[in-house]
Protein backbone atom coordinates (compact mmCIF):
# COMPACT_ATOMS: atom_id res chain seq x y z
CA UNK A 1 0.00 0.00 0.00
CA UNK A 2 1.33 3.42 -0.93
CA UNK A 3 0.82 6.66 1.00
CA UNK A 4 -1.72 7.78 -1.63
CA UNK A 5 -3.68 4.54 -1.26
CA UNK A 6 -3.65 4.90 2.53
CA UNK A 7 -4.96 8.47 2.27
CA UNK A 8 -7.72 7.36 -0.11
CA UNK A 9 -8.76 4.45 2.13
CA UNK A 10 -8.84 6.58 5.29
CA UNK A 11 -10.75 9.39 3.56
CA UNK A 12 -13.35 6.83 2.44
CA UNK A 13 -13.70 5.35 5.94
CA UNK A 14 -13.73 8.75 7.69
CA UNK A 15 -16.46 10.50 5.71
CA UNK A 16 -16.39 13.56 8.00
CA UNK A 17 -12.82 14.32 6.83
CA UNK A 18 -11.82 15.40 3.36
CA UNK A 19 -8.98 13.71 1.50
CA UNK A 20 -6.91 16.90 1.96
CA UNK A 21 -7.43 16.80 5.74
CA UNK A 22 -6.45 13.13 5.87
CA UNK A 23 -3.40 13.82 3.70
CA UNK A 24 -2.35 16.67 5.99
CA UNK A 25 -2.75 14.51 9.09
CA UNK A 26 -0.72 11.65 7.62
CA UNK A 27 2.03 13.99 6.40
CA UNK A 28 2.22 15.63 9.84
CA UNK A 29 2.31 12.26 11.60
CA UNK A 30 5.14 11.01 9.37
CA UNK A 31 7.04 14.29 9.81
CA UNK A 32 6.74 14.05 13.61
CA UNK A 33 7.93 10.44 13.53
CA UNK A 34 10.94 11.37 11.38
CA UNK A 35 11.78 14.31 13.67
CA UNK A 36 11.55 12.08 16.74
CA UNK A 37 13.89 9.49 15.24
CA UNK A 38 16.20 12.23 13.99
CA UNK A 39 16.59 13.44 17.58
CA UNK A 40 17.52 9.90 18.67
CA UNK A 41 14.28 9.12 20.49
CA UNK A 42 12.23 5.94 20.22
CA UNK A 43 8.61 5.76 19.00
CA UNK A 44 6.25 3.18 20.49
CA UNK A 45 2.75 2.53 19.20
CA UNK A 46 1.22 -0.09 21.49
CA UNK A 47 -0.08 -3.13 19.66
CA UNK A 48 1.56 -2.03 16.41
CA UNK A 49 5.27 -1.78 17.11
CA UNK A 50 8.20 0.48 17.83
CA UNK A 51 10.62 2.48 15.74
CA UNK A 52 14.17 3.11 16.89
CA UNK A 53 17.65 3.69 15.54
CA UNK A 54 20.22 0.91 15.26
CA UNK A 55 23.91 1.62 14.77
CA UNK A 56 25.69 -0.05 11.85
CA UNK A 57 29.40 -0.28 12.60
CA UNK A 58 32.01 0.79 10.03
CA UNK A 59 32.88 -2.01 7.64
CA UNK A 60 34.58 -2.80 4.39
CA UNK A 61 32.21 -3.21 1.45
CA UNK A 62 32.65 -3.90 -2.25
CA UNK A 63 31.93 -1.74 -5.27
CA UNK A 64 29.62 -4.01 -7.33
CA UNK A 65 30.91 -2.63 -10.66
CA UNK A 66 34.65 -2.87 -10.03
CA UNK A 67 34.84 -5.36 -7.18
CA UNK A 68 37.26 -3.07 -5.33
CA UNK A 69 37.08 -2.64 -1.56
CA UNK A 70 35.32 0.42 -0.18
CA UNK A 71 35.48 1.59 3.44
CA UNK A 72 31.97 2.35 4.70
CA UNK A 73 31.47 4.65 7.68
CA UNK A 74 29.34 3.72 10.65
CA UNK A 75 25.80 5.05 10.56
CA UNK A 76 22.42 4.92 12.25
CA UNK A 77 19.55 3.26 10.40
CA UNK A 78 15.82 3.18 11.25
CA UNK A 79 14.60 -0.09 12.74
CA UNK A 80 11.01 -1.33 13.18
CA UNK A 81 10.08 -3.99 15.71
CA UNK A 82 6.49 -5.21 15.33
CA UNK A 83 4.33 -5.44 18.44
CA UNK A 84 2.75 -8.66 19.69
CA UNK A 85 -0.72 -7.91 18.26
CA UNK A 86 0.68 -7.12 14.80
CA UNK A 87 2.88 -10.23 14.83
CA UNK A 88 -0.11 -12.40 15.77
CA UNK A 89 -2.32 -10.88 13.04
CA UNK A 90 0.35 -11.36 10.39
CA UNK A 91 1.12 -14.88 11.62
CA UNK A 92 -2.56 -15.80 11.11
CA UNK A 93 -2.45 -14.84 7.41
CA UNK A 94 -2.61 -17.77 4.99
CA UNK A 95 -0.96 -16.71 1.75
Swiss-Prot record:
One of its GO terms (cellular component) is chromosome. PROSITE patterns: HISTONE_LIKE. Keywords: DNA recombination, DNA-binding, Transcription, Transcription regulation, Translation regulation. Residues 56-76 are annotated as: Disordered. Gene3D superfamilies: IHF-like DNA-binding proteins. GO terms for biological process: DNA recombination; regulation of DNA-templated transcription; regulation of translation. InterPro entries: Hist_DNA-bd, Histone-like_DNA-bd_CS, IHF-like_DNA-bd_dom_sf, IHF_beta. SMART domains: BHL. One of its GO terms (molecular function) is DNA binding. The keyword Transferase does not apply. SUPFAM superfamilies: IHF-like DNA-binding proteins. The keyword Transcription regulation applies. Belongs to the bacterial histone-like protein family. Heterodimer of an alpha and a beta chain. NCBIfam families: hip, PRK00199.1. This protein is one of the two subunits of integration host factor, a specific DNA-binding protein that functions in genetic recombination as well as in transcriptional and translational control. This is Integration host factor subunit beta. It comes from Shewanella baltica (strain OS155 / ATCC BAA-1091). The lineage of its organism: Bacteria, Pseudomonadati, Pseudomonadota, Gammaproteobacteria, Alteromonadales. The gene is ihfB.
